[in-house]
From Swiss-Prot:
Component of the NuA4 histone acetyltransferase complex. Its main location: nucleus. This is Chromatin modification-related protein EAF1. The gene is EAF1. Residues 450-463 have a biased composition (Acidic residues).
Amino acid sequence: MTEVGAADLSRLLQSKRNECSSIVTSRKRKLRELFVVATQSEGLPHPVLTNPDAPTTTPAEWQFLQANDINQSKTLNEASIPTRPTFSLEVLKKSLAKSIFIANESVPKQTSENSNKSHVTDAQDEQQSNRASLSTKSDAAATSTRPNTPETSTESATTANPVPPPAKNTQAVLPPADAIEKPIPTTSPDVPASTGANANSITNEEDRSDPNEVASVPRQPQVTFETGTKGEHVETGTSSVKSGHGVGDSAVTTGVPSTVKPSADVTRSADALSSPGSTAQSATTPAVHDDASTDTSPEHEGPQYVEPAEQKKIEDGTHERDTDKYHQSHQDGDIRAPSTKDLEDRVLEAPPDSAEAQLLQESIRSNVAAENEAALNSESTSQEADTAISAPVSEDVNMSDVDDRVVKAAPTVGEKVEEKRAQQILDTDAKSALATGAPAEISGSKEIPDSQEEAPEQMDVDAPEPKASTESQIGAPISLEKLDAADTGPSSPTPAHIAEVATPPEPVRQNSPPKAERAVTRVSSGAMRPKSVSEIVGVTPRQTPTLEHISTNKSTNHQLTPLTSTPKSPTLRHRHISAHQRQASRSQPSTVVFGKQSKKGEEKSMVTSQHDTILPTEDYYTPLFVQGFAGSSSWMQPIEKILYTANKTVTTPDANLAIQDHQACKVLRRVYHLQQHDKWSLRQPKRCPEPTRPPSHWDVVLQEMKWMRTDFREERKWKRAVAKNLAYACAEWHEATPEERKTLQVQAVVPPKMKPASDVAMVDAEGTNHLTPDLVSSEDVESIDNLDDLIEDFPETIAPSAIFNLQDEDVVFGLRRTAAADQLLEELPMFGAPLQVPKFDLTGPEWDPDAHWRRPALPLSKYVEGHMKLVSDGPPRKRSRYNYQNEDSDDEGEAGFVSSDSTPSLPLPSATDEVALFNPEMKHIRDRLYVGHQFRPPSEYPMPSQSFFECRSPSQWTIAEDDELRSLVREHSYNWSLISSILAPRSIFNSGAERRTPWECFERWINLEGLPADMSKTQYFKAYMGRINTAQNMINIQNQAMAQQQVNQANGAVTPGRRRHQSIPFRVERRRNQKHLTMLDAMRKLAKKRETTAQKQQHTASQNAANKKTNESASQRPTKTPGEYSRLRYERDQALAEKMAQFASRQEAQRRAVLQARAQGQAAQMAAGTPAAVQAGQNSAQAAAAAAAAAAAANGMNGVGRVNVPNQLAAAAAAATGQARPRMPMQSPAPASMGGVPAHMASGLVPPNQMNSVQQAQMQAMQAMQGQHNRMPMPNPPPDVSLMMRAQRISEQQRAAQMHAQGGPGTPGQGAVGAQQSPPAQMRNAMNGVNGINSNPMNQQSFLNNAQAMMAQFNQGNLSSPQANGLHMPSGPAGSIAPRPQTQLPAAIQAQLNQLEAQYRAKNSSLTSEQARQMATEHLTRLMMAQRSAMNAAAGTAGGQGGLAGSIAATTSPHQYAALLRQQQQQQASAAAGSPGQQHQQPHQAQHQPQQQQSQQQQAQAKQQQPQQQVQAHAHAQAQHQAQQQQQQQRQASGSATPSAG
């Protein structure tokens, strides 16, 4: 992202200009070639193709170039390409006949005409195999006038380097055709023979080019004939010429250039198909060359022969045409050898000046010479045939055509005559070359290899290589210059007969090093074209070349031809798959085929582009277009709808796909609109220059933070190094022997402990102290004395800035303070610039704090060569051990926008290796920790039960799965859990056939391998096998029973059941995967169930709608206004007030009657004797009841609203203290508590109605209080009339009894009193019976009878019938269901409950408030029960019978218990006073007696209890003190919270 320098910019611009000019030139040449190909069918004009800037020949061509001129920003318009003329059938027949029936030329002219024949080099063919498909050899004429200085200098340079580089390999030029005298028999049709391409002229161009560049210019397409015109390359037993360095062995025999080309070996068989692209056709004639070498495989490349480079410059178009005719003369047919008569007829038919006539004439002469030498060559033919068959075949052979064999045909001309003639010619030319000195330009005698041609549009044609050339040039003198060039081309193995006959006059052996194999062939690189005419006519499949472009700097280094190798050890060469496909697929006949233009871009730039070709389908606007089309079309749905209607599972990436696509389309739409409005340019302007921002304090802080980060990192490295060294030192000490430890110890003396000196005069101490050292400047902190101390105490402590040049594990050494050390430290580099305080100068700041991110914009947009891709990190994943970054690295990615590649270039090793037990090097540790090779079952899982084996479905195993199970058991050593996890299918839903549990794998392995003999006898495996066998027997029994049932019920309509299979695993050939079918079936059933449910609901709704009356209006409750509700409330309150007033008046009358009765009783008691005690007790009870009634009446009349005061407790308090206002603010308990009130309190109890005078008026207030506290009680129900009437009846009975007692004697009076009080006793017993205390069936029945009578009496007033209070049923108006009000606890007990609840919560914080309250209540209840039992024990009543204990047993709340306790105190006081208190316990005993015997037993009980009451009084006096304390606390707590009634 930084700016480019001026020098680099100029070089870059120059390279871009050169590239642009080369692109324009190349495009123009290609356009002209295209026009020529489209308009001409046979000959192609060479000057036009070699010089793209040449003037156009026709106006049509000029118009075509103008219509497609790239300088005018025009692209290729295919409509402007002219239509190619049709190729007539006659021309096709003539071309095929001419190419098939041409014979080899045996005696070519040895004049300058023959010597001027151009033999094209295969090196140039390899180098320029990718050039323009229509370039020809006529450019040699244009370059013949080129000065020969470069060639001469190149050759001289080559002479100085006799040993060529091993990586260059080209082919030598063929010798003249006059040495070729023998026709060649047919060979394998699909294996082109190695021809002159293996013997073409080579020049020393490897020193002038980069070996890494590849020639990439389209080459001339060619048409080759069926091979077989060239002798088979066979291994020689006597010659040491290898295919890798055979060139050197044959080419260094002499330094004289060869001017005579030896004849070909006519007895060779076809070579293996290697690189057919080397068979290039000449551009001046439509003739087809079958002898062009396609053999570049290492096994079939023979020696190379080089001619001087000056010969190339004297060639002209005629010479090239002669050369092509010469090539055609070697194409004697693989099908048949034409006769001289046929050739003469064709000569007469052909035009006299045409190339065809000349070629036919030469073919006639070749046939004549061949017939003369046929007899002499018959013997050598059979011998070479055997050798040819045994010759190795190249890897490039198309092995698909196995029926094509190497077949030897008619015998050829004697090769000895040919060899002698060729040797003479070689010697003659060599002497003439030596006479002229350095290689010079010899007219008509030498050739210039095409590899030296520098024209970028050069196109070469392979020349045939007669086999005799190898044997002739073995003895021919060849210059060292040719040696270098020859060594760069592929060579063919020397035939056996050549090695035997050749006798070099000056044998010079050169041991060249073996050449390295190259993995790229001309076929694989597309440099050659594997298509021949024989394949066109249907003999072999054709091969299509891949064309490439060549850069301006071309040389032999561009060749992709592999070096040769020894035939005995052929090396594999990589070929493209596409080449094989083209070979196998294209076998249709055709004529001249021109190569297709490669899609690969021109590689002419200085830097090779690494970007892939952008296909039209990879346009980054494609998602936008697809989205637009999906939105407008009806058959194409967007991704959102597709995902919404998906039938399968949609994963998170699938769901994110729609979001990402929407985001991408949003960005692309914006970019598209900007481009449409010319606001999105590929060239971006540079950033506008802005004034430099003055540095701020924050910039300094950031700099310091970065410096501290670096400092801390370096210090961490240093500390790690120190720790590492210390750890190694400790380990070394630990492992060392005592002797070694002595050597490791530091020779140091422990200083003696200093004894605390006593007080010494300072005068004496001055003489013994050392002198104070001189002060050292603050900079010199490391003096010599301090240095020793530092080394001893802290040997590895030093600043991190001094360890720049050391390794991470090294520690800084001590450095003595010297001038050299100071200079060294000053010259050490620093990690960062020292911090500087910024100068806040707005005119010219010293540095730009924004320089690290504010950089000049790139001249090109990133979208020019890149694609717009939205990359998401995906879902968060657990961090792997391999996913870490080097924390000590300084690469912070501060410019993260520059490089978007956050992935490390190299894979990081694991951060820790503690979990590397499965590595191979950890196997010994693994074996020591766990014996894995020992046989064991999956004991980490429980053994399956027998029912599992009976009910399971058998698992299915294929042969592959069985083999995998065996291998996993061997590999993982009976680790059944791991084996199961590997074999288990990767799916959540696994059927029984796919079950791969550890026990299932173990069972299958036992079925395959069997249990070991010693293991099968153990009890463990006996039980295991027993379960399996028993389960199978049970399945068999079930199947038999089912079959028997079917037989017995054969005549019935019983559906036969499915026979069960064995549940053991079994093998199948292929397991049917019914997983998806099962899932679909389940989905279908679920959908059907839902549809059925919906239909039923719809049907039910429709029926309900039909059954409903249409005109039936919904009954609406009359709505009342708030005023109406207020009036109703007022009326009800008034009615209640009137009732309460009436009730109060009655109670007042009763009170007065009680007082009057008491007074009368006291007077009667004084008159009578014994009955006075009983009457006194009754009078006291009546007085208490009257006082309670008076208090209740006062509360009701005053309307203070003490609605929560229990009536029973108020009565008890009134009876005990005689006061009219109780101080217990407690809510009245449930009516059931009345059942537990003893007989002596029954007369004083008043119904709760007297306390509820203003309950309805305070309903809203009570509800508000309930909302404030969840434990506030509900308002009391309406007054219970039954209790009121019951209390009234009791009062009346007591009054009547009192009056009766006053009127009669004592004993009858007492009996009357007992008789009058019996109904309340019965009622009390019945109520207690309902409560489960002292129950009696007779009493219950009597109570129910009385209750029914009372219900019948009070139902007339539309009041609810009184219920048994023991049933805990609330009473109220008829039809109302009111909840039972909760008991409101006093403040003292509430505080105690809260304290207990807090303690429970502190012990267990998980308790809820309800649980804590319940536990506290239970604990407090237990405490109160314990206190009550203590009271009973103190009172002397066993089992809670009689007295206060009986009454306590019937109580249901602590409030009643407190009230009873106060009444007990009153009783104790009266008992202590005299006999009236002693008679107070009579009602307790009377409640357990039947009604008939109660009056008779009362007198006896009174006499018997008189001594007991005295003992009990003493016990009560002891318990009284304890009860008074609790009572006092309750009174204080309740009195503070209880409002007064007055």
